[in-house]
A protein has these predicted regions:
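Accessory alpha-helical/coil subdomains and C-terminal extensions
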Residues: 1-75
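C-terminal non-catalytic interaction/assembly regions of soluble proteins
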Residues: 43-194
Length: 194
C-alpha cells in the first residue's frame, strides 16, 4: 500500500510465507510504493511537469528481489499501457460513470463553465448510487487523495473489509462494448475544421 512505508523485510516475509504455504504467490503493488525515507522503490529519476517522480519498474524490482532472496520463480508484470487498452474489461458501473462524467463535462462547457473537472459523489443509502459534481481544477491539480488508514489492515499489506465494501460496487456489472469483426467498434467522428 503506497500510503504506508514499504519494508523489504516485511515484503520478503509475506512472500516467503505465502509461497511456502501455497507454492505460488501473486503480489499486487503500487508504482507509488516508497521506503520510510521517501525514496520510491523503483525511481527512474525522471520527473513529470509537476516535478513528481515518473514511476515505473516496481514489479521488476520486486520480482528480482524475491528471486534473489527467496529463490522462487518470478515474473514481474507491469500493467502500464495494458490497463489503458482494456476498456472491454471495464465494469458496467465504470462505463456508466464515464458516460455521466462526459455528459456533465460537455453540458457544463457548453454552459460556459471552464476550469473545472467532473467528480463523483456517492449518495447515502443502502444501494450504491453516485452523482456528478464540478470541482475547481485548482482544487485537484497537483494533489492526491490517499486511501484512509482505516481501509488498510494492521500489517499494511492488504485492505480491510470496510474498503472492500466501498470498492465492490465499483466493479459490478459487465459491459458489452459493441464489436465489429472481432474488434471493439469505436465512433467515427467527422473531421470538421473550426
Amino acid at each position: 500500500m503506497p500510503e504506508l512505508p514499504f519494508s523489504q523485510e516485511q515484503f520478503l516475509t509475506d512472500v516467503s510465507r505465502i509461497y511456502k504455504k501455497n507454492g505460488k504467490v501473486i503480489v499486487a503493488v503500487s508504482e507509488g510504493a516508497q521506503y520510510a525515507d521517501g525514496r520510491f522503490v523503483a525511481d527512474s529519476g525522471v520527473r513529470d511537469a509537476f516535478g513528481h517522480a515518473q514511476l515505473g519498474g516496481v514489479a521488476t524490482t520486486l520480482a528480482n528481489l524475491a528471486k534473489e532472496k527467496i529463490g522462487c520463480k518470478v515474473r514481474g508484470i507491469e500493467f502500464s499501457l495494458l490497463q489503458r487498452c482494456a476498456a472491454h474489461c471495464a465494469s458496467l458501473t465504470d462505463v456508466n460513470e464515464a458516460y455521466m462524467a462526459g455528459e456533465a463535462a460537455v453540458l457544463n462547457a457548453v454552459d460556459g463553465k471552464t476550469d473545472y473537472c467532473v467528480g463523483f459523489e456517492r449518495t447515502n443509502g443502502g444501494d450504491y448510487h453516485c452523482g456528478v459534481k464540478l470541482i475547481k481544477l485548482d482544487d485537484v491539480a497537483n494533489t492526491e487523495k490517499k486511501l484512509p488508514r482505516e481501509w488498510i489492515n494492521r500489517e499494511g499489506n492488504f485492505v480491510t473489509q470496510e474498503y472492500l465494501d466501498y470498492a465492490l460496487p465499483l466493479i459490478q456489472g459487465e459491459s458489452r462494448p459493441p464489436m465489429e469483426n472481432g474488434l471493439p467498434r469505436f465512433a467515427k467522428l467527422a473531421k470538421i475544421k473550426a
